[in-house]
């Protein structure tokens, strides 16, 4: 049995991920003719924050509209206001120089990170088992069976100060997805040497 916990801080403030993993494996030779194996694995992954790629306008978050890419915003947003202003004005809201610009696509990266929520949770349960039975000398039966069940939840929200909220208004969505699969295989092997 094993347990693992991983915590990563994201490239953007207010972002990162947490992952829990629990696994249990068993292997037993019941007698000379029968052996069994089994494995159960459970993962819980939570990814939070908006990240740095895309503008989130599609489900994959991989929109190629580069002017709204978060990393581009970080690199283009000016770090100081100049000698006639106060640098703290850049941290508190919009850039005063650009606040009246019609069609301005520049966004304070700190405000963007605080106003854009893209939280994803994934729970995955996998179980596999197998048995090998030696029927007679040279004749072996093997069965492998497995299942996978996954729950996925995505909560997406753009506040009124986000670049998307400023252009299109506040909006959000919640998406739940549930998937499952099952597999089995049976193999009969006869091994006779002449």
Map each language-model feature to its residues:
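Transmembrane beta-strand segments that form the barrel wall of outer-membrane beta-barrel proteins
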Residues: 3-7
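Active-site and adjacent substrate-binding regions of carbohydrate-active enzymes
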Residues: 138
């Amino acid at each position: 049995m094993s347990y693992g916990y991983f915590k990563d801080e994201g490239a953007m403030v207010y972002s990162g991920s947490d992952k829990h993993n629990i696994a249990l494996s068993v292997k037993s030779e019941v007698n000379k003719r029968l052996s069994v194996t089994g494995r159960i694995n459970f993962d819980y992954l939570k990814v939070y924050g908006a990240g740095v790629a895309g503008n989130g306008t599609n489900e994959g978050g991989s929109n190629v509209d580069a002017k709204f890419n978060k990393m581009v915003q970080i690199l283009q947003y000016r770090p100081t206001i100049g000698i006639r202003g106060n640098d703290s004005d850049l941290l508190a809201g919009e850039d005063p120089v650009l606040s009246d610009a019609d069609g301005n696509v520049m966004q304070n990266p700190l405000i963007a990170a605080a106003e854009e929520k893209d939280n994803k949770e994934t729970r995955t349960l996998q179980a596999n088992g197998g048995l090998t039975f030696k029927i007679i000398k040279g004749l072996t039966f093997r069965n492998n069976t497995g299942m996978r069940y996954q729950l996925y939840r995505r909560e997406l929200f753009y506040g009124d100060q986000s670049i998307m909220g400023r252009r299109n208004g506040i909006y959000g969505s919640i998406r739940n997805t549930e998937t499952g699969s099952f597999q089995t295989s049976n193999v009969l092997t006869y091994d006779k040497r002449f």
